[in-house]
Amino acid sequence: MSDSSSVYDWFQERLEIQDITDDVTSKYVPPHVNIFYCLGGITLVCFLIQFATGFAMTFYYKPTVTQAYNSVSYLMTDVSFGWLIRSVHRWSASMMVLMLILHVFRVYLTGGFKRPRELTWVTGVVMAVITVAFGVTGYSLPWDQVGYWAVKIVSGVPAAIPIIGDFMVELLRGGESVGQSTLTRFYSLHTFVLPWSLAVFMLMHFLMIRKQGISGPL
């Protein structure tokens, strides 16, 4: 008996992984499913690329107003393949947004949001909002002129909301003006809060799809 077979048997005896494999591989796929039904999966792949490249960049990025821009420049010019890692991160971000939009259109046009899949649609909408938040927070992290003024404009938008507007602006900025506290908050949102939030809603989304199956043709 080979070593690989022995290892498999060890796990099979304890976890019954063959049953899990059979369940995954035997799931019924309706005949009307075509390439456009892969858009959600492509969005997931883009997110995984984002996670991997973003994690790699945290080894070099310094979230301070005095060092952020220089750390990004160092990553692009001095770190081996740093330019490639950041470029892939940016390209996959654009691709993720595009695939998400196309996925939403596909689901809407094929009626995939209708009963009994309303909650699947709701989790998808929440993930779309989180994805936009990713773009807004990530755009500011290089802390160049574009990033700074983007933060200033975006964080000032809630000021138009009656009663709580000023509070929301101060909450986003970490004070009355844009500065170190703002960058720290946007960095925390971009690298911790938003990824984990998206991961939770993705899990919910996939579990519901797994339970209810793919919607039928119109």
From Swiss-Prot:
CDD domains xref list: Cytochrome_b_N (cd00284)
Predominant localisation class: membrane
Protein name, entry field: Cytochrome b6
SUPFAM superfamilies according to UniProt: Transmembrane di-heme cytochromes
Membrane spanning stretches: 35-55, 93-113, 119-139, 189-209
Pfam families cross-referenced by the UniProt entry: Cytochrome_B (PF00033)
Co-factor binding comment: Binds 2 heme b groups non-covalently with two histidine residues as axial ligands. Binds one heme group covalently by a single cysteine link with no axial amino acid ligand. This heme was named heme ci.
Function: Component of the cytochrome b6-f complex, which mediates electron transfer between photosystem II (PSII) and photosystem I (PSI), cyclic electron flow around PSI, and state transitions.
Intrachain disulfide bonds: none
Quaternary structure annotation from Swiss-Prot or TrEMBL: The 4 large subunits of the cytochrome b6-f complex are cytochrome b6, subunit IV (17 kDa polypeptide, PetD), cytochrome f and the Rieske protein, while the 4 small subunits are PetG, PetL, PetM and PetN. The complex functions as a dimer.
